[in-house]
């Protein structure tokens, strides 16, 4: 008997022993990608694109400032006479780098490689004027890194190099805190009693790291904030309808949140003709390989609402400003909808004079 044959026999014997032990433990050895695919059971009941429409949020109508800037506000927050806040749209600026057909100048607020820096500065002044009535209101930003880092800011931070973080908080009047988005979820928080405010940028990575929940914890330490005195607004971002992700994102959420799996749906993304007449397309597949017909979609708005609840806020204290950036490319900038070439919106909040 050759040495190769004896090695093959020993390996086969060892594998049989391993299979026996795994069966006794209620497990099974992987047989490779093909076997895993053939035995795969759906993790979710697949939703068709038509069924996903019910998850598509209606966009709120923006307010139009006297300088032409269009922006969105959280319902009920106007009652807080000292509060400045707003969620910008792409409308009402001077930028031409991302201008759609027939559109006027747009309100890009990020220093992107495609836009002129002076134009962006002018756009930021226009937004400050629309929100506060004064274009010179200091604007504090951060260098966003998809983290859970939150910094406390004062007036001097407006002139300093932006800190590496994804959240800002202050109890100092006269400045605007700002986070930038083009699909990620902006969250603004107000302490009505202590007159403190915060802004958070929550992409999926920041959401998994609990930036909103930990940021509210920082407000409690810095300002003595109590959950019952807080109110929050979740601004426009990419909706479940448009936000497809990979299995690794599902794994991250499942590892961090007991409700993580419930944030996902599996969407059938094949076109209606292919779904109705699948045999017509068989010759387009390689033997043994089916098409990737479903994709996971995640609800980041609900994920951050859950974090606000976990931080102690009551459901009635949470406002959701509707609008999917992926669906409404006419109203919002969207990194995904534009193939990666997009401007940036700002969500701003600050403490102004009592009105």
Cite the ranges covered by each PLM segment:
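Active-site microenvironment for binding and transforming phosphate-containing groups
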Residues: 2-355
């Amino acid at each position: 008997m050759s040495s190769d044959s004896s090695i093959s026999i020993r390996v086969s014997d060892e594998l049989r022993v391993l299979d026996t032990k795994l069966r006794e433990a209620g497990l099974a050895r992987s047989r490779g990608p093909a076997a895993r695919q053939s035995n795969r059971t759906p993790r979710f009941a697949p939703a068709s694109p038509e069924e996903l429409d019910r998850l598509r949020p209606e966009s709120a109508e923006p307010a139009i400032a006297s300088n032409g800037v269009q922006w969105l506000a959280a319902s009920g927050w106007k009652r807080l006479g000292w509060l400045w806040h707003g969620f910008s749209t792409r409308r009402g600026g001077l930028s031409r780098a991302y201008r759609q057909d027939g559109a006027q100048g747009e309100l890009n607020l990020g220093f992107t490689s495609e836009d002129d820096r002076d134009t962006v500065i002018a756009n930021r002044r226009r937004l400050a004027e629309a929100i506060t009535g004064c274009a010179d209101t200091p604007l504090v930003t951060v260098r966003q890194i998809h983290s859970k880092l939150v910094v406390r800011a004062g007036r001097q931070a407006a002139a300093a190099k932006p800190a590496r973080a994804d959240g800002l908080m202050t109890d100092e009047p006269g400045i605007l805190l700002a986070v930038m988005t083009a699909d990620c979820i902006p969250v603004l928080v107000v302490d009505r009693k202590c007159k403190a405010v915060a802004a958070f940028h929550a992409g999926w990575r920041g959401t998994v790291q609990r930036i909103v929940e930990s940021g509210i914890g920082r407000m409690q330490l810095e300002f003595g904030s109590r959950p019952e005195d807080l109110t929050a607004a979740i601004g426009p971002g990419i909706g479940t309808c448009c936000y497809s992700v990979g299995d690794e994102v599902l794994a991250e959420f499942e590892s961090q949140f007991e409700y993580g799996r419930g944030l996902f749906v599996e969407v059938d993304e094949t076109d209606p003709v292919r779904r109705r007449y699948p045999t017509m397309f068989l010759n387009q597949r390689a033997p043994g390989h089916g098409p990737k017909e479903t994709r996971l979609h995640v609800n980041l708005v609900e994920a951050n609402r859950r974090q606000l609840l976990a931080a102690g806020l009551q459901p009635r204290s949470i406002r959701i400003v509707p609008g999917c950036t992926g669906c409404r490319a006419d109203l919002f900038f969207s990194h995904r909808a534009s193939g990666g070439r997009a401007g940036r919106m700002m969500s701003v909040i600050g403490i102004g004079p009592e009105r």
